[in-house]
């Protein structure tokens, strides 16, 4: 039988060396031989098999040229160690492959979040790079617009390149500062002319009062003419008429003594009253005409 020949060859060659205690089941046995029950042997055959020994005599190494027994497993001259390793490899191949597959699946499951994180990191980096690119583009656009506006103001004296625009703008700003300083000085001069005096020149205040003047306007004109004849400049005049009394105050610039200015004003007022039509009355007039004047230094 095929099973007996297989076990006989295995016991003779391999089982005694690798499995001293028991003989393992062979993975190469057909399923039908294992599942189907063997027919019961005849009594004579059973007695003969009972007398047979479990061991066979060793007849020496089988030569390569000798024919193999019917149903025996031939080794083909292969080393026993290699055969055993091949058998064990075939027996453990399925389990090892399964363990390897599970390990690969676990590694792949662990790599999925890492890939996702790497993908998210790449997205963040790409978005940051995009925002940086947009900000840089906006900055360059603003800079170009500023150069264009500056060139519009200095186009007559500048070339189109940026260095010429900046240099021309700097020169133009310096010229504007010089012009501003000149205008400020001119403004101060005009203010001094409007005020009508030089701050270095002394100033005095002339005050006079006239009771019942014949003509207040004539009195004022006469006083101003007399001051003009003395090269005296009037800075300001303030006058008021209360009842029959004329009160006048003048601020004048003069280098003449204050007493001389006072005498000149009094003489001018007296001359106005003499020239009036009713000047037949003895001076200072029957109308009780009186005049007083006062000069005080302001500066």
UniProtKB/Swiss-Prot annotation:
Residues 127-176 form the bHLH domain. Gene3D superfamilies: Helix-loop-helix DNA-binding domain. InterPro entries: bHLH92/bHLH041-like (IPR044658), bHLH_dom (IPR011598), HLH_DNA-bd_sf (IPR036638). One of its GO terms (biological process) is response to water deprivation. The lineage of its organism: Eukaryota, Viridiplantae, Streptophyta, Embryophyta, Tracheophyta. May act on an initial response of jasmonate-regulated gene expression toward drought tolerance as part of a BHLH148-TIFY11D/JAZ12-COI1A complex. It is found in: Nucleus. Residues 102-111 have a biased composition (Acidic residues). Interacts with TIFY10A/JAZ6, TIFY10B/JAZ7, TIFY11A/JAZ9, TIFY11C/JAZ11, and TIFY11D/JAZ12. This is Transcription factor BHLH148. Plants over-expressing BHLH148 display drought tolerance. Residues 141-176 are annotated as: Helix-loop-helix motif. Residues 90-127, 273-299 are annotated as: Disordered. GO terms for molecular function: protein dimerization activity; transcription cis-regulatory region binding. Belongs to the bHLH protein family. The keyword Transcription applies. It comes from the Eukaryota.
